[in-house]
């Protein structure tokens, strides 16, 4: 970065944000977004329509927590965050179960990460992620005999119809 740093300083007068983003951790990016002025949060969020800045902040917070679980070797599939993502049209379109007015799945669990990815990743990238996730779930089901697929999906917060997530438009 030092050689490139001097190039960017000479060319742009400073290090552009898009260059800096390549060397920041995901947690740093999440924190940086949180302290952006509202106008900048709004501009960034518009690149991920239909998300608003509040939803973007929630997605980044939950994704950061899950990234940390992975990085520190904790158990991923049953992990739940204290933070939750906002209700999205996908929660309703997938007919996720509710308790009162609160969705029981896809808020603080691993399925919340899948929902966030659906909104944040380009369509082609999300389809590749989904394909790999299906393959991994199938592998676990073959290799782990003491837990059924339904039980595994339930522990991760996935509804039975989770694969339908790509059938629906995001807004």
Stretches with model-predicted labels:
Residues 20, 29-65, 72-171:
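Polyanionic, low-complexity intrinsically disordered segments
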Residues 1-5:
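Conserved small/polar residues in nucleotide/adenosyl-binding loops
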Residues 9-12:
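Active-site acidic/histidine clusters and adjacent loop/turn architecture
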Residues 14-22:
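Long, low-complexity, polar/charged, intrinsically disordered or flexibly structured peripheral segments
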């Amino acid at each position: 970065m030092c050689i490139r740093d001097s190039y960017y300083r000479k060319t742009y007068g400073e290090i552009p944000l898009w260059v800096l983003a390549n060397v920041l951790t995901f947690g740093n990016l999440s924190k940086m977004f949180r302290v952006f002025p509202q106008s900048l949060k709004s501009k960034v969020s518009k690149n991920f329509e239909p998300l608003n800045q509040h939803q973007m902040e929630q997605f980044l917070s939950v994704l950061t927590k899950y990234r940390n679980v992975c990085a520190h070797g904790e158990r991923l599939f049953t992990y739940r965050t204290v933070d939750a993502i906002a209700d999205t049209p996908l929660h309703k379109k997938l007919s996720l179960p509710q308790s009162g007015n609160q969705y029981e799945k896809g808020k603080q669990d691993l399925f919340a990460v899948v929902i966030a990815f659906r909104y944040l990743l380009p369509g082609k990238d999300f389809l590749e992620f989904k394909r790999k996730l299906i393959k991994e779930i199938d592998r676990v089901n073959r290799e782990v005999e003491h837990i059924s697929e339904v039980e595994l999906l339930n522990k991760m917060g996935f509804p039975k119809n989770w694969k339908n997530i790509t059938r629906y438009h995001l807004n």
